[in-house]
């Protein structure tokens, strides 16, 4: 069974195309116009093991908010569609990822119930010229809502003792941790082929 999806989201603010194959090999074709965001979406493909295309044209002459939000919404919708009825999946996934001085934990439940908890310290306002660090939480909230998942992202350590957080490392470690957790949660459990992982019988 093919676990793929294609989502096109068009508004007066953005035009987004997302294609995903949950059983891919980490290939990525990413163009959002926000360089650091492109870098983060590459992490999702590589560390999630997904083949991922994200093409976005947005109103970057205003700011990056709509572009980043709508790409996250479309990505979540693509994951939701690719999962189908969610039968046979492991459902739960968790990963703790270090990136030098930073340590991040992510936990995922493909529950069908959108809920996001995100905890990170104050960071420098921008990474690169146009990625506002305040948007990271909103990305996870938008993604979790449209993917219909429960997602917890906790920055356990943001800096070495006495140091200041490196925003690049803090955000990148989050994307890598979430990707690894998603990889586990979306993977198929051969012991329960065709079985929805819930006592309710549906997710």
UniProtKB/Swiss-Prot annotation:
Protein name per UniProt:
Imidazoleglycerol-phosphate dehydratase
Q: Which UniProt keywords apply?
A: Amino-acid biosynthesis, Cytoplasm, Histidine biosynthesis, Lyase
May I have one GO cellular component term? cytoplasm
Q: Listed GO molecular functions?
A: imidazoleglycerol-phosphate dehydratase activity
Source organism's superkingdom? Answer: Bacteria
Catalyzed reaction equations: D-erythro-1-(imidazol-4-yl)glycerol 3-phosphate = 3-(imidazol-4-yl)-2-oxopropyl phosphate + H2O
According to its UniProt record, which protein family does this protein belong to?
Belongs to the imidazoleglycerol-phosphate dehydratase family.
> Kind of enzyme, top EC level?
lyase
Output one GO BP term: L-histidine biosynthetic process
Q: What Pfam families does its record include?
A: IGPD
What gene is behind this protein? hisB
Name where it's found. Answer: Cytoplasm
Its Enzyme Commission number(s) read: 4.2.1.19
* Pathway(s) annotated for this protein in UniProt: Amino-acid biosynthesis; L-histidine biosynthesis; L-histidine from 5-phospho-alpha-D-ribose 1-diphosphate: step 6/9
**Which PANTHER family does the UniProt entry name for this protein?**
IMIDAZOLEGLYCEROL-PHOSPHATE DEHYDRATASE (PTHR23133:SF2), IMIDAZOLEGLYCEROL-PHOSPHATE DEHYDRATASE HIS7 (PTHR23133)
Q: What is its main location?
A: cytoplasm
> NCBIfam families from the xrefs?
PRK00951.1-6
Task: Kindly give the InterPro entries that the UniProt entry links to this protein.
Answer: IGPD_sf (IPR038494), ImidazoleglycerolP_deHydtase (IPR000807), ImidazoleglycerP_deHydtase_CS (IPR020565), Ribosomal_Su5_D2-typ_SF (IPR020568)
